[in-house]
């Protein structure tokens, strides 16, 4: 079936090779392996937590110096020095840093919604632009069949 415990195998044979598929070079892999390679990515990272805290500080009118320190800690780790540090951060800089730091980690959609840029995304199909209801997902038919008290989210066809 491809499932092993709580993990999902890429192929039933476990035959995953360095050359297979698209691969982000963000995480290195053991080049001595010829198969059964691990290619997991992290769900939460310290950098993500720092950036979330910095965002919360800015959104709540908190300590900008602390928010700036947190973002710069992420940048210093990424660049290896303080040459790219910010003097001060705002939501736009934090959103940009999240794009750099968390690329390929499944944060983009929710980040764009939270920062109010989802409907402006250049990859969004023209027929969906300006339809704010698409910021939330529809309730699935399966969920509704389980609980018929659910009402479909606005903008989507009713059950």
Residue ranges and their predicted role:
Residues 41-74, 91-103:
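Extended, hydrophobic/aromatic-rich amphipathic alpha-helical segments that build helical scaffolds
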Residues 25, 71, 110:
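A broad, low-specificity signal marking well-ordered, structured residues that form hydrophobic/aromatic
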Residues 4-7, 16, 23, 63, ...:
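Compositionally biased, intrinsically disordered low-complexity regions
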Residues 10, 58, 65, 81-85, ...:
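Secondary-structure transition/capping residues
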Residues 36, 41, 75, 83-159:
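Long, intrinsically disordered, low-complexity segments
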Residues 1, 6-7, 11-46:
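Flexible, polar/acidic helix-loop-strand segments at domain edges
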